[in-house]
């Protein structure tokens, strides 16, 4: 399960998800990827489940990069507890994902295999996604534009 080794603050506020992703919104390492089209929280268990689904389908064929990391703790209070008496204990970790963020990248396999592997992974995730290729992000004068 993915989680930070150590954190500055054990509990954080929930925050709100506004706007589009400004970082990690293009394919940097692989040839194919899966890109979020809506915002949401992806837990470390969901990331791991998607990773296993991709690796089982591609077998030993390609290389996979996980481009998101769960660095936000989510707290929960025990069941049947009265209101008050402080914030609950951290139960699990989530990655905050905005629209446009590339979640996984894949290389070393053909497009059909990559498309099916990413489809299987998308079923494990709580956000809507789309399949993207490296050629979708063309570089124009040092700036990467979505084509």
Swiss-Prot record:
Query: What do we know about how this protein assembles, alone or with others?
Result: Part of the 50S ribosomal subunit.
Question: Which Gene Ontology MF annotations are present?
Answer: rRNA binding; structural constituent of ribosome; tRNA binding
Q: Which NCBIfam families match?
A: rplP_bact
Q: What superkingdom heads the lineage?
A: Bacteria
- Mind telling me which residue stretches traverse the membrane in this protein? none
Q: Which GO terms describe its biological process?
A: translation
Record's keyword annotation contains Cell inner membrane: no
In terms of PROSITE patterns, this protein maps to:
RIBOSOMAL_L16_1, RIBOSOMAL_L16_2
| InterPro entries listed in its UniProt record | Ribosomal_uL16, Ribosomal_uL16_bact-type, Ribosomal_uL16_CS, Ribosomal_uL16_dom, Ribosomal_uL16_sf
Highest lineage ranks of the organism? Answer: Bacteria, Bacillati, Bacillota, Clostridia, Eubacteriales
Q: Which Pfam families match?
A: Ribosomal_L16
Protein name per its UniProtKB record: Large ribosomal subunit protein uL16
| Any single GO CC term annotated in Swiss-Prot or TrEMBL for this entry | cytosolic large ribosomal subunit
Q: Which organism is it from?
A: Clostridium tetani (strain Massachusetts / E88)
Q: Which UniProt keyword terms apply here?
A: Ribonucleoprotein, Ribosomal protein, RNA-binding, rRNA-binding, tRNA-binding
What family does the database annotate?
Belongs to the universal ribosomal protein uL16 family.
Record function comment: Binds 23S rRNA and is also seen to make contacts with the A and possibly P site tRNAs.
